[in-house]
């Protein structure tokens, strides 16, 4: 892989609501200065999170941009730069190349930053950190988890699903700094490395998130999302855990990775752990599903944030959405099939018809990305986040793994828990495999609309997509090519 420029974003202050994330990038800093103390490592880790929120990644393409367009969630001709790639499947179009190159380069740049941090922290003892061992381990754990997550996103886009080709060599796994020669390795090896990194990461963040600083998660939505109500002596760096790769989020990502790999037993184990311990049906209900009362009115929760385990933060997200999403992107007419009028579902209340006399702007949109002008901090804080993984996905993973294990009734119970939490009054009770997967995939569409996750369920299962009555086979069109400049290893 060609040399990637190291770019660290520096954060100046750690006091006040989200000050650790709101500061803009500054000049590059000499390594010896940046990594001379614990504050430098905090700065570099914050920069890694900010880079993950860029429009090439979770700020657009890995959420409401390419991934959503690939899932055929937008109307034909009513999307932006993704149209050539996701509608026409033209990977050679100039706009397609910008997307393909952008995701790859920014993701690997972030991986490089993770590896640089991990190399430098080896030389700084735990006594140099304000919160000692737990802080040092937490920083190592989060950087390791981000490295795994970036590789996982690249694998899902730039390689066929493991169900199609697990032995093919498509992307490298880069876990050292500097990285000068990194040939692609088999998908099975990439998955092994991803899982290894996530397993290591969850152990490293465990002390901070479940013992020393547990109230930053147990404190509920205001603390996790808005940083309110709880602060360690170390400062607000230890709050906002929804914006961080926390202990529970990492377990959820492990469940997602195992499921994508086709390892249902391990996916079930990880999902069950989260389900039985941290959700509304668990021993410590630190997360819950947004109550219907919070889905309407001036203080509505636009992103249904109560069950988000990890979300990227971008202070300029609304600016990007206003410039692109609101005036251009319109939902597929198929959305009416996903939310039939006769089947009550409060998620349908987030879909509206654009009121305009301009014909080309007519169509339906999701209000998920609308600006909240609420006076409550936890509602307004949702303006700047892009969900990366939710508790509901853990429920879906657990349900599917139970179904594959022959525990059909238990699988339906778990699936219906999400459906009912979202306002449905009906119970899904069909036990056949085809019917189960049809309902599961429809739930993905309802739950993750424009969040960029639905497409990967179809790719993982090798299920064809639909565009109205048109069948779109799940084939090589949905695997991005490695950028030309990266093909010399």
Predicted regions and their residues:
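Bacterial Sec-dependent N-terminal signal peptides
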Residues: 1-26
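Conserved, well-structured interaction surfaces
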Residues: 42, 83-158, 180-192, 203-205, ...
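Inward-facing hydrophobic residues that define packing positions of alpha-helical scaffold repeats
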Residues: 45, 111-114, 191, 198, ...
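Membrane-proximal, proline-rich intrinsically disordered regions
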Residues: 17-69, 271, 412, 426, ...
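Hydrophobic-face positions in mid-chain alpha helices that act as interaction patches
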Residues: 219-223, 227-230, 237-247, 259-262, ...
């Amino acid at each position: 892989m060609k040399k990637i420029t190291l770019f660290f974003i520096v954060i100046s202050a750690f006091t006040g609501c989200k000050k650790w994330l709101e500061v803009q990038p500054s000049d590059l800093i000499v390594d010896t200065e940046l990594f001379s103390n614990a504050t430098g490592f905090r700065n570099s880790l914050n920069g890694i999170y900010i880079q993950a929120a860029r429009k090439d990644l979770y700020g657009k393409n890995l959420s409401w941009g390419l991934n959503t367009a690939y899932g055929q969630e937008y109307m034909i001709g009513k999307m932006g730069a993704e149209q050539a790639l996701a509608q026409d499947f033209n990977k050679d179009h100039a706009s397609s190349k910008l997307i393909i190159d952008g995701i790859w380069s920014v993701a690997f740049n972030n991986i490089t930053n993770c590896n640089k941090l991990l190399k430098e922290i080896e030389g700084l003892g735990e006594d140099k950190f304000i919160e000692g061992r737990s802080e040092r381990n937490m920083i190592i754990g989060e950087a390791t988890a981000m490295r795994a997550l970036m590789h996982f996103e690249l694998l899902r886009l730039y390689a066929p699903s493991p169900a199609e080709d697990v032995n093919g060599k498509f992307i490298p796994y880069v876990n050292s700094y500097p990285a000068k020669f990194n040939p692609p390795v088999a998908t099975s090896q990439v998955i092994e490395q991803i899982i290894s990194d996530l397993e290591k990461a969850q152990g490293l963040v465990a002390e901070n998130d479940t013992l020393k600083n547990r109230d930053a998660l147990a404190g509920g939505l205001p603390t996790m999302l808005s940083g309110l109500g709880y602060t360690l002596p170390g400062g607000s760096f230890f709050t906002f855990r929804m914006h961080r790769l926390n202990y529970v989020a990492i377990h959820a990502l492990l469940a997602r990775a195992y499921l994508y790999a086709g390892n249902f037993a391990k996916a079930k184990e990880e999902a069950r752990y989260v389900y039985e311990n941290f959700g509304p049906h668990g021993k410590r209900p630190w997360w819950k599903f947004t109550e219907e009362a919070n889905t309407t009115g001036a203080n509505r929760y636009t992103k249904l944030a109560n069950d988000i385990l990890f979300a990227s933060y971008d202070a300029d997200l609304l600016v990007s959405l206003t410039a692109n999403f609101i005036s251009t992107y319109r939902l597929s007419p198929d959305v009416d099939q996903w939310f039939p009028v006769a089947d009550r579902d409060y998620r349908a209340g987030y879909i509206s018809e654009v009121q305009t006399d301009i014909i080309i702007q007519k169509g339906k949109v999701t209000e998920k990305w609308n600006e909240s002008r609420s006076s409550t901090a936890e509602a307004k804080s949702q303006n700047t986040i892009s969900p990366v993984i939710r508790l509901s996905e853990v429920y879906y993973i657990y349900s599917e793994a139970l179904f594959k294990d022959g525990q059909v009734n238990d699988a339906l119970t778990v699936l219906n828990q999400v459906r009912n939490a979202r306002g449905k009054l009906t119970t899904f009770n069909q036990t056949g495999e085809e019917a189960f997967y049809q309902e599961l995939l429809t739930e993905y569409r309802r739950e993750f609309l424009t969040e960029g996750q639905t497409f990967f369920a179809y790719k993982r299962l090798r299920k064809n997509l639909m565009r109205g009555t048109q069948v779109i086979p799940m084939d090589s069109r949905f695997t991005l090519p490695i950028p030309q400049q990266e093909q010399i290893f």
